[in-house]
Amino acid sequence: FFPRIYDKPEIFRQEGWHYELHDGKLTQSGVVFNEMKGAFSSPEGVLEREILNSLYPDTTYANESGGDPEFIPDLTCQQFLDFHGRYYHPSNSYIFLYGN
């Protein structure tokens, strides 16, 4: 529940998104950003998102958990930390035990 990003904000820039300069051209990059670009460019991914959005418009299933690459660069490290602090907390979890 307490990832290193709280004391190492450079993790956000590496994992989330950042700018890179290649051959004089400035591009956006980052682990999550690139993964989501790939997911949003696959026909199967587009179809799945449209189906889920149509079937479950007012639920979390209508949203892509990794984020839309068009909007990922708008996310700031502080917004990410605020979201994490609010939702990724033990008080928001359930524990289920099953068996004999």
Please give the residue ranges for each predicted region.
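Charge-rich, well-structured scaffold segments of protease-associated domains
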Residues: 1-100
